[in-house]
């Protein structure tokens, strides 16, 4: 499905991001995964190479809240492979702090990574994609971008922003043959969800009509579809993968 494609996946060392990397590699893509630390990048690369030594995968660890570092890393990928066909903006953080305990610093932290970090990756990549005649950008949103959540207001705020960024750029970049979509997972078995208070997870899980949280592999399938030619006329979409949680 992705033979010959070059993909960059941020937040690609664990959880949904790691499964996206696996799906892309298994379907013929060359992948550069971005992680937050060298240790996590090295661990992910080791796991992937042990699974299939023939997979073409590399790793980088730019600070995603630093526009210059992100641009440098993106340009290094382009210089090595000659192009970037797919950009997946999956890196992000969650919060569950009640408003009355919230600090401006906490709010800034989640906005800086979840919103600005995506913009910093898109800006140089979109220019590359325009020059090469097109490409595909997929952002990770969330179910709470539609439903909201009762604590940690910075997180749903950031994901509402991701949706707006996705839809607006789909309209702006369509003429350059760049598709821009987002995937909005529901409760999924990731480290981020595991870090939430148990009562928060239980409350959210109770509203899943399908009766269980999602698996990272199931969410990654949506990213595979959107990156493939099967989605060649799909752009500006926020694809929910949430077991009908928002239905």
PLM segments and residue spans:
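Conserved glycine-rich Rossmann-like NAD(P)H-binding loop of the short-chain dehydrogenase/reductase
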Residues: 27-43
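Active-site helix of classical SDR
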Residues: 122, 158
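Residue(s) in the substrate-gating loop at a strand-loop-helix junction
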Residues: 142
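Substrate-binding pocket helix/loop in short-chain dehydrogenase/reductase
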Residues: 98-99, 106-111, 193, 204
């Amino acid at each position: 499905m992705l033979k010959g494609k070059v993909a960059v996946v941020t937040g690609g060392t664990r959880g949904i991001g790691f499964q996206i990397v696996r799906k892309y590699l298994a379907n013929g893509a060359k992948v550069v995964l971005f992680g937050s630390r060298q240790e996590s990048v090295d661990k992910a690369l080791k796991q992937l190479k042990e699974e299939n030594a023939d997979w073409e995968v590399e790793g980088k660890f730019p600070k995603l809240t630093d526009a210059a570092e992100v641009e440098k890393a993106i340009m290094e990928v382009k210089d090595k492979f000659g192009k970037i066909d797919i950009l997946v903006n999956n890196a992000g953080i969650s919060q569950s702090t009640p408003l009355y305990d919230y600090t401006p610093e906490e709010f800034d932290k989640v906005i800086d990574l979840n919103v600005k970090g995506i913009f910093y990756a898109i800006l140089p990549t979109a220019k590359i994609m325009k020059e090469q005649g097109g490409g595909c950008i997929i952002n990770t949103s969330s179910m709470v971008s539609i439903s909201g959540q009762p604590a940690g207001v910075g997180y749903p705020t950031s994901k509402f922003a991701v949706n707006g960024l996705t839809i607006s750029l789909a309209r702006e970049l369509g003429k350059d043959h760049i598709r821009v979509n987002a995937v909005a997972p529901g409760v999924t078995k990731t480290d981020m969800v595991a870090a939430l208070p148990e009562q928060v997870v239980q409350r959210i899980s109770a509203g899943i009509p399908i009766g269980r949280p999602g698996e990272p592999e199931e969410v990654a399938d949506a990213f595979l579809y959107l990156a493939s030619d099967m989605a060649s006329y799909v752009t500006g979409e926020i694809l929910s993968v949430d077991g009908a949680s928002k239905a």
